[in-house]
Amino acid sequence: ISHQSIANYCKSAAMCIKPFVDHYDYGTGNVFTADETYIKIRGVKAYIWFIMDAAKRSIIGYQVSDNRGVGPCILAMRMAFRNLKELPSHFKFIADGYSAYPLAAQQFFYELKDPFKFNITQVIGLTNDDAVSKEFRPYKQMIERLNRTYKASYRPTNGFDNIDGANYDLALWVAYYNFLRPHK
């Protein structure tokens, strides 16, 4: 079996599994955490956006993009909010200090009004220099661990040949992470 045959099998499996993973109702809690990390596609940086439900540790939103702008962040958030009619009470959305997250939150309020009005709790830096960082650092560490877990499986690929390959790989990995991998 050649490496191309395996790539073709993965593509076929991803096309079957992705709709299930994307539309599954994960029964989310009231704390979401988000981050982005970079990958390489033909030696050029691309980005993967993750949004995770902190209680169940399920990936509820993800996106591969060729840029780090607000657009891919909004797409990942749309996926995360897909099964919600309104935000849970005491909702928290925790991210790093990157400006795309508050801009995406503004877009949701602009489009959907009060049922989706929320603020981003930004945990900035590596140390607990303020009360917000001290309180919410465990959530940021949770999403950073997710990034490292993904990168551990991504590293042996030496990058992707195209964005489709990155999307297929990510869909299969999210299915593995959410449904097959044991969560502690």
Q: What is the meaning of each model-derived region?
A:
Residues 88-103, 123-126:
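Acidic/histidine-rich, metal-coordinating catalytic segments
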Residues 97, 109-138, 142:
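Conserved beta-strand -> loop -> alpha-helix junction used to position metal-binding or nucleic-acid-contacting
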